[in-house]
Amino acid sequence: CMGGTQHTNGNNNTRAYCALQLALGNMGVAGGGANIFRGHDNVQGATDFCVLSHSLPGYYGLSAGAWKHWSRVWGEDYDWLKARFDSITGKDGKAKSLMNLKGIPVSRWIDGVLEDKDNMDQPDNVRGMVFWGHAPNSQTRLKEMKAAMEKLDIMVVIDPFPTVSAVLSDRTDGVYLLPASTQYETYGSVTASNRSLQWREKVIEPSFDSLPDHVIMHKFAKKFGFADRMFRNIKVNGDEPLIEDVTREFNKGMWT
């Protein structure tokens, strides 16, 4: 796991994990091996969904074929999706759709705000930022990050507790804190590094006004007017999408 490998004795830790599994007879058998859960809760699952800037879920990339594949899975019209993306003029003078271009990674979002837009491969600077389960003190360039936060039009922090994201800047407006539930206040699957799934049940109800991530996401989609498209294949009970249907949908698209 990330806690073991990033330790000062990471190599020795990893060798010890493997030696322990060998001693217990858990190597070379079904369900065996040192297939751990990466880092904090469900890092592998998030990676498989590719909530990053360079790929669609399942590591399909951003090609037209990848978009058409996921359009079929979602039951969405590919041309409608394509029309939602702006385009830029490349160095060769040809128009390029942002749909097929890599976005700004989380480590460089600061530049998306502060950089001269003439130097960027997108029509405008980043004007809004959502920190969802992410504290910026895990990155460098905090002085520039503070300046970027203060330049944003809007900043949203979604976490069980207020993080550095909520207090780093000196801005007094345009910051919204949304309390998210912890892993014990919801249910669903988490994925190990060998892609095996572990299903977890809810232990307690969400505390106070906090909500699970998938409920917050549905509320956003409904507010922005595309919930009917986003949850076309997913049953929604009130404001809570059915996790089992979410699981069926991503399994349908990620056979690899």
Feature map (PLM): residue ranges:
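Non-catalytic alpha/beta scaffold blocks inside enzyme catalytic domains
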Residues: 1-16, 23-29, 36-255
